[in-house]
């Protein structure tokens, strides 16, 4: 069945236009709340990692690593939808989005700077890297993060930061993990 998806981008175009007063059909009220809801669940896994009793320690580490990567990814999306772009000159002072690290739903968080948000995202990426071990998933679990996802996200974040060498290095790690055939690249 073919459907008309012409309105699928309305949500993002309304954010871009800052059209809060007369939203069109398909525009979500408080669209940012969806992302913070996902962050809440990721924080719940991270905060309760010592209480997880099912599965091996390797499985638990993988799950917690995925929660860190998911939290970083949600902050990254929020920063790019609702914050200013990363610039080396403006990042330390320019306000972006609030970083959510815990489960407290009552606290009203102040906005963090662009630099603080990107530092938090990179911290979550490194936390995920230290815990995750699954290089690839079988098709039924293809929606889950893997070690390749960690490097892919790092590469994307570093590209947005203008750190070209670090972005290239992260992308190169993906290449080296995926392809074991001889290559002009040094994957050692």
Question: What spans do the regions from the language model cover?
Answer:
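Conserved, well-structured interaction surfaces
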Residues: 8-82, 112, 130-132, 137
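Single conserved hydrophobic/aromatic residue that forms the stacking wall/gate
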Residues: 179-188
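TPR/TPR-like (Sel1-like) alpha-helical repeat modules
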Residues: 172-176
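Short coil/linker segments at helix-helix boundaries
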Residues: 82-115, 119
